[in-house]
Curated annotation (Swiss-Prot):
Tissue and organ distribution: Highest levels in testis, ovary, pancreas, and heart.
Species the sequence originates in: Homo sapiens (Human)
Protein name: ETS domain-containing transcription factor ERF
Bias-annotated ranges (Polar residues): 532-541
Known DNA-binding region: 27-107
Acidic residues: compositionally biased ranges: 431-451
Subcellular location: Nucleus
Intrachain disulfide bonds: none
Residue(s) of cross-link: Glycyl lysine isopeptide (Lys-Gly) (interchain with G-Cter in SUMO2): 465, 481, 512
Gene Ontology molecular function: any one: DNA-binding transcription factor activity, RNA polymerase II-specific
Posttranslational mods: Phosphorylated by multiple kinases including MAPK1/ERK2 at THR-526. Phosphorylation regulates the activity of ERF.
Pfam families: Ets (PF00178)
Stretch list, region Disordered: 130-169, 184-225, 280-304, 342-478, 492-548
């Protein structure tokens, strides 16, 4: 790793790997793009333009060739390189600028410290040029947990609202807040500062004439922290003119006499976005106290880049999956500030398992579940299905039937659900294939004498008479298809001369077997008997005419 003095550049180790061997995976594409943007010899190939963090690729083929040389891939072209850039869209590292060709924009406030957790800002060397991008609003590559809920505020809100600070905050914190409120600056990068400033011993010819910046800001001069002199240092302000390698085409500085305080560290944001930003997250009163550092007053110890602090910092950033701008990482513990925490899907309490309870209507259960109650509620079982309801109705109908009113209630139950077969009728089920082979004794005389007797094919003695109320249910035993089939076979036997009497007896026997009552036996068979008699008479007349 070259020293910052050698390279003239002070990106941290994780952001730029100049000593990585060709073909290695130690450097990423966005690191390489930042490397090209900082070098003046590649200004005709790629350069900053437009908004903060926006750059344009002027020669896509040359950029792809340089990337291929760096990665030892001679077949690299811009098509492959653009696919690699699209991979960064989901990573929130950069995105494509709509309406502009070959123009992309870095999301510097989304570049978080994940893969390179242990860095020491105090050892960042001496050379801090202006060629690197400035500190973005709300954070930088060194993204600390926000000390205020400023990320969830809209940009149109008043940035000069007084900060929420406690009376126990340190005098240093109060002085910084007073200066920033007096300045009224909104954006962290409104002054064109970079996170990597120029060194104290830079070339005086590069600075335009003007009063020095250190004595230009209001308030007392910023004292160095006595307990840790290596972490925070006072850095000079940048030049007042436009910078050729800065993301800003024109520096937003009003002039050399702007009232700006010196920068504490290139890794820390300078001015608040909406509320007061602090030099370190642990200088804020919103940071939980109890640090064990030398400065126990105010918000606790300073951020020391210890493994515990870095672990706590990384855990805060891993919670930004759901509700990114309403994540709990934006609301640190502060006793005087009540912030409603968002409902996260992974922290919703699971309802307990519901025991067997009597069913309730679905509307009532939905209303009870939708209403938020402070106590735990039990879920009701789902309503009964069609089979369970039918079984319940059968049980109720059977109880009412055994109670006494058999006829009327049986008809009502039959209208709601199919009733069970009547126990009084002794009928053997006959399938469609076996129906033609059933042999029944001749009961044609009984049909005329005693039509109310139902007989089975194999039981010579007459069974008990059925109740008149159950006769309609018994008439449904024979399927309609079988009934038409037997009528057709009977007509065929009559036309073929097989004797109408035998066919008539078979039909009567089938009706007896299927358990039809006397009313039905006389009703549907009467027109059929007439038709069979007419057919028999016409057959006899035709035979007589043929004989004569």
């Amino acid at each position: 790793m070259k020293t910052p003095a050698d390279t003239g550049f002070a990106f941290p180790d994780w952001a730029y790997k100049p000593e990585s061997s060709p073909g290695s995976r130690q450097i990423q594409l966005w690191h390489f793009i930042l490397e090209l943007l900082r070098k003046e010899e590649y200004q005709g190939v790629i350069a900053w333009q437009g908004d903060y963090g926006e750059f344009v690729i002027k020669d896509p083929d040359e950029v792809a060739r340089l990337w291929g040389v760096r990665k030892c891939k001679p077949q690299m072209n811009y098509d492959k390189l653009s696919r690699a850039l699209r991979y960064y869209y989901n990573k929130r590292i950069l995105h494509k600028t709509k309406g502009k060709r070959f123009t992309y924009k870095f999301n510097f406030n989304k570049l978080v410290l994940v893969n390179y957790p242990f860095i020491d800002v105090g050892l960042a060397g001496g050379a801090v040029p202006q060629s690197a991008p400035p500190v973005p609003s709300g954070g930088s590559h060194f993204r600390f947990p926000p000390s205020t809920p400023s990320e969830v505020l809209s940009p149109t809100e008043d940035p000069r609202s007084p900060p929420a600070c406690s009376s126990s905050s340190s005098s240093l914190f109060s002085a910084v807040v007073a200066r920033r409120l007096g300045r009224g600056s909104v954006s962290d990068c409104s002054d064109g500062t970079s996170e990597l400033e120029e060194p104290l011993g830079e070339d005086p010819r590069a600075r335009p004439p003007g009063p020095p910046d250190l004595g230009a800001f209001r308030g007392p001069p910023l004292a160095r922290l006595p307990h840790d002199p290596g972490v925070f240092r006072v850095y000079p302000r940048p030049r007042g003119g436009p910078e050729p390698l800065s993301p800003f085409p024109v520096s937003p500085l009003a002039g050399p006499g702007s009232l700006l305080p010196p920068q504490l560290s290139p890794a820390l944001p300078m001015t608040p976005t909406h509320l007061a930003y602090t030099p370190s997250p642990t200088l804020s009163p919103m940071y939980p106290s109890g640090g064990g550092g030398p400065s126990g007053s105010g918000g606790g110890s300073h951020f020391s880049f210890s493994p515990e602090d870095m672990k706590r910092y990384l855990q805060a950033h891993t919670q930004s999956v759901y509700n990114y701008h309403l994540s709990p990482r934006a609301f640190l513990h502060y006793p005087g500030l009540v912030v409603p925490q968002p409902q996260r899907p992974d922290k919703c309490p699971l309802p307990p398992m519901a025991p067997e309870t009597p069913p309730v209507p679905s509307s009532a259960s939905s209303s009870s579940s939708s209403s938020s109650s402070p106590f735990k509620f039990k879920l009701q079982p789902p309503p009964l299905g069609r089979r369970q309801r039918a079984a319940g109705e059968k049980a109720v109908a059977g109880a009412d039937k055994s109670g006494g009113s058999a006829g009327g209630l049986a008809e009502g139950a039959g209208a709601l659900a199919p009733p069970p077969p009547p126990p009084q009728i002794k009928v053997e089920p006959i399938s469609e294939g076996e129906s033609e082979e059933v042999e029944v004794t001749d009961i044609s005389d009984e049909d005329e004498e005693d039509g109310e007797v139902f007989k089975t094919p194999r039981a010579p003695p007459a069974p008990p008479k059925p109740e008149p109320g159950e006769a309609p249910g018994a008439s449904q035993c024979m399927p309609l298809k079988l009934r038409f089939k037997r009528r057709w076979s009977e007509d065929c036997r009559l036309e073929g001369g097989g004797g109408p009497a035998g066919g008539f007896e078979d039909e009567g026997e089938d009706k007896k077997v299927r358990g039809e009552g006397p009313g039905e036996a006389g009703g549907p068979l009467t027109p059929r008997r007439v038709s069979s008699d007419l057919q028999h008479a016409t057959a006899q007349l035709s035979l007589e005419h043929r004989d004569s």
